Amino acid sequence: MSEKVKPYKESELGKKEQVKQMFDNISGNYDGLNRVISFGTDVKWRKKIVAFLKEKSPDSILDIATGTGDLAIAMANTGAKNIVGLDLSPGMLEVGKKKVANKNLQNTIEMVVGDSENLPFEDNSFDAITVAFGVRNFENLEKGLEEIHRVLRPGGNFVVLETSVPTRTPFKQGYKIYTKYVLPSIGNLFSKDRSAYKYLSESASVFPHGQAFNNILKKIGFIGIENKPQTMGVASIYVASK
């Protein structure tokens, strides 16, 4: 389902290449725009992930679709000794590397270019794996999740933060109006890539959230699966283990 929506409808490139191009294009103002369009709530959601993982005391964490490194940097507070932030977009990673350096976290966090559907790591490599606002951008969702399951250690924790669609009135109607009209308009004003924020809202609307995503995780082989709706259902935090 998530494969049907691509950033650039006129492009002949595959979804993966288009997503890489899109995030390279918007990397310069991505952080600021995220704070604006989410009213700062994305920061609170990430703090919940950090609090959850801190209780698990992982030594190693892989943050997939790390972007500019917000979650990877925040997870330094978990006490993890080794955090790898992986992303398709060199442009996003360049911003992230500067943020890591500004926090003096170069010895803890490594930022690497990589593909979530072909992870450059051995089996059972990480105590925890996270993806924030990234799984809906996978070209092949199940293949990406299979790779995550492969490199996660037995007993390790997998945490996903992803947008979802509210089901209750009036939040459902308000969400549709905001994502269809307001979010793309904000993107048009502040981003040089007019298609990017339209894609981000469209991809969120078709992503298999809630129980549908739980079922996919179960199919892949994850256990202990839970999803926790956030802020009236506009996002969800999914937790699972191997």
Each PLM stretch: what is its role?
Residues 1-20:
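N-terminal auxiliary segments of SAM/dcSAM-dependent transferases
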Residues 17-18, 88, 161, 165-216, ...:
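C-terminal alpha-helical "lid/dimerization" subdomain adjacent to the S-adenosyl-L-methionine
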Residues 29-32, 38-59, 74:
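Conserved alpha-helix/loop element of class I SAM-dependent methyltransferases that forms part
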Residues 60-118:
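Class I SAM-dependent methyltransferase SAM/SAH-binding core
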Residues 117-128:
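A short acidic, Gly/Pro-enriched loop at the edge of an enzyme's catalytic core
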Residues 214, 220-242:
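Core SAM-dependent methyltransferase catalytic element
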